[in-house]
Curated annotation (Swiss-Prot):
Family matches, as Pfam families: Ribosomal_L21p
InterPro entries according to UniProt: bL21-like, bL21-like_sf, Ribosomal_bL21
Name recorded for this polypeptide: Large ribosomal subunit protein bL21
Subunit structure, as described in the record: Part of the 50S ribosomal subunit. Contacts protein L20.
Source taxon at top rank: Bacteria
Keywords of the record: Ribonucleoprotein, Ribosomal protein, RNA-binding, rRNA-binding
Organism: Staphylococcus epidermidis (strain ATCC 35984 / DSM 28319 / BCRC 17069 / CCUG 31568 / BM 3577 / RP62A)
GO biological process, one term: translation
GO MF terms held by the record: rRNA binding; structural constituent of ribosome
Disordered, as annotated region: 79-102
Function: This protein binds to 23S rRNA in the presence of protein L20.
Protein's gene: rplU
NCBIfam families for this protein: L21
Amino acid sequence: MFAIIETGGKQIKVEEGQEIYVEKLNANEGDSFTFDKVLFVGGDSVKVGAPTVEGASVTATVNKQGRGKKITVFTYKRRKDSKRKKGHRQPYTKLTIDKINA
């Protein structure tokens, strides 16, 4: 059985036991997190939401809160001695999908 959930403005296909990385969630490590925005549930019986499936949810456990690799943003204006160098690390949450309730 699999489901398509929406989190962080993205749609992600998940299965039970799968580990996924999503945009940062406000939860601590070891906490249980429930996704209520389930757009599609597949398997033996297919349920398509309009826009979400009524009564469906996906439960996950938070494994880790972290930050991604650093990217460098460098801008300059030629002949003006104007340059700026910035770095950015995107925060993420690592989850393990425990159960899909449909």
